[in-house]
């Protein structure tokens, strides 16, 4: 890959009403005629099986595709209230600068200003290029594949916006500084997702280099948790590829089995999750949304889950179950081929790229970033890690009209 060698950098200030903010598409949708409130979170309800992602707060179910946009906002509000913490308002001002391989983003809100950076690697050939944001700046989708497909790589050290402070759960980083204590109940996964959204703003400000309509996000392990949150909470992300994300990422909380990281451990290890999650630690079945519902926030866009069945701590069987349940959402929206899960790999090394993943990742890139014909994304689990969805739910996907 190459770096930008222009003699002068680009500096643009984005007035966010002109640059589509995160979730903008959903915000333009009117509430259904039945009067459902699209900003209302689902209430806690104890249940051992996976919650119905089509169930509204009033007890009715989504009946049409046009109602899904409102339901997505309900699920989003529920995920904020019970899992991640509040995302907060969109910033008043974003400035983005690219100088060589350095991206600098400056964000202003309420008289305060913060700055963070990322590293850009461009593929050979003329732009504008699709872009893959790598949360954490390590691992992620194979470099050789990105180069071959003409995709730029943006390495993002997400701890700049949300620091990992261990068991103290102290909130530090640009996201928390910008909001001056108002978001201290929010977890760092949401802060990382916010940082990815600001990089999408930066991409939108440099359309001669990068394509704002062809942005992907990836990351492995804890960064995979952040990649999923980024894709779930920003509809401008065309393709999300969480890798070996473990508890707090793809796997369903209710289904984490023996050897997998328990919810209380994930909550206490780092301030990844919002403080609202603590209310469910004694009874995880009281969560009104599980991670299949978070995956559903990505629908009908591209989502490819890459998993590792050789490390019990990652909870691959619960990840496969979560993907199967989420696939019902894509199916109801008529977009089955846009969701994939691949966990059938021979190598158990954590965060190593596997040859088995190259073909589905290539198809995902071609399908969702390049607009090319490509195979539907697979749903493939390793023997011994495959889930049977039937006993894990008491709902069926509706036939949305």
Label every model-predicted segment.
Residues 129-131:
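Alpha/beta-hydrolase fold active-site loops
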Residues 191, 195-199, 217-220, 242, ...:
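Extended catalytic-interface subdomain
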